[in-house]
From Swiss-Prot:
It comes from the Archaea. The gene is rps15. This is Small ribosomal subunit protein uS15. InterPro entries: Ribosomal_uS15, Ribosomal_uS15_arc_euk, Ribosomal_uS15_N, uS15_NS1_RNA-bd_sf. It comes from Methanococcus maripaludis (strain C5 / ATCC BAA-1333). Keywords: Ribonucleoprotein, Ribosomal protein.
Length: 151
């Protein structure tokens, strides 16, 4: 599979082992995991970071295998999931930081190209999320509204 904005191939990654039952070495129960997810969500952590913490510090290999629900669905049930999806939010944050950099360094052409690529990816994601009804049909990306959302 190729990279999105280059002709290069992507680096191959390892695949998650196929498991159907919970490993016996996992010490936390499903209720404890859900409580820990809600606790970390209250602290303002994103779902990807919560998954990494559960994996690295608590030895939980796969939340969905143990609880039957994903981290983001547990956060939605508890009311801690944002109205804008996390991948879109992170891209908007990246675009805002790049815009701030370009205000101070207007001749940085490489960053200008990078900003165009990031914003085209944002528009593609917005189109997808509008089609799947995650975002409202009239939701549009603009740098000003993104700055208000992120800050």
């Amino acid at each position: 599979m190729a990279r999105l904005h280059s002709g290069k191939r992507g680096s191959s990654g390892s695949t998650r082992p196929l498991r159907t039952e919970v490993p016996e070495w996992v010490s936390m129960s499903a209720e404890e995991i859900e409580a820990k997810i809600v606790e970390m969500a209250k602290d303002g952590k994103q779902s990807a970071i919560i998954g990494n913490i559960l994996r690295d510090m608590y030895g939980v290999p796969n939340v969905k295998l143990i609880t039957g629900k994903s981290v983001s669905s547990i956060m939605k049930e508890a009311g801690f999931y944002a109205e804008v999806p996390e991948d879109l939010f992170n891209l908007m944050k990246k675009a805002i930081n790049l815009r701030n950099h370009l205000e101070n360094n207007p001749r940085d052409t490489h960053s200008t190209v990078g900003l165009k690529l990031i914003e085209s990816k944002i528009r593609r994601l917005v189109k997808y999320y509008r089609g799947t009804k995650v975002l409202p049909a009239k939701w549009r990306y603009s740098p000003e509204t993104a700055r208000l959302l992120v800050e």
